[in-house]
Every structure is written in C-alpha cells, then in structure tokens.
C-alpha cells in the first residue's frame, strides 16, 4: 500500500491520519501500534502527518484561553508562524496559514506591518470557531506557502520544503 517517502524514526507526537474517504482521524501520541489498531478497525490510512498538536478532536477544542499549552515541538505559548488543517464535514476542509516572526507586509500609506503569527491557543480557537470536527497543527515555521485559485496568500518559505498538501476537484469533463 502506498509509497514510502521517508523511512526515519518518529517521535510520539499527535498524528493526523487521512483515510481513503478523505476523513481525518487523530491519535494522541502516534505509534505503529496505533496505526495497526486503526487499520484493524477498517480504516485505511492513505496519508499520515506527524507533527501536531491536535487542535480540535471530535468537535472539542483541545486548548483554551488562560491555560498554558504543552507540546514539545511548537513553542505553543509564543506567537509563531502556523499552518493548520481542519475537517468541516465530508470532503470539506479548512486550511489556515499565518506568517510570523520576520514577515513584513506593505501598508497603503507606504509603511509596513510585521506579522507576529499566533499561539496554539489562538489557532485552536480560530479552528473551533469555524466548527471543525477535527483540526491539526502542521509545521508553519517559515516552511509554508499557500496558493489558492491562482493567488498567493503566504510566502514565508525560508527553507527547502519537500512536502505538499494539494486539493483538487474531480469534475466531469463533459460539463
């Protein structure tokens, strides 16, 4: 099944598993055993992302304002560039990218504005406000670009990127 693109050991971060129907399944602390359990339950993993953390799980927000977020690889309590993906319903998704740290945007008056990014709590609240059933934080630390319908929405890529999440609509060529 599938093609192996990377064959390295992984840390036990939360994992986002996307099945053949395009549905999201999230495990806290990913392991080969958890993947086997999922597949034994009849869910075939087509894509697995290992970064995290999970932001919304089964419609429940996982981080709340006033709480200190704990997660090993994301500086969760500091504003940073972030990328998140959420599932709103069957084959309905939300992608969010926020630049941060060093990104400057021009203002109409000729000045510039620095993008500060956001915290994990802020990102969680945003994804929950759009009623995501599942939402997951992907790596956004100067390694994300978002293009949509021919337009560029984020270009904070400052290092080589070898991964892509791509959405396409299958349309009947006769219509």
Regions found by a protein language model. Name each.
Residues 1-175:
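Gly/Ser/Thr/Pro-rich low-complexity, intrinsically disordered segments
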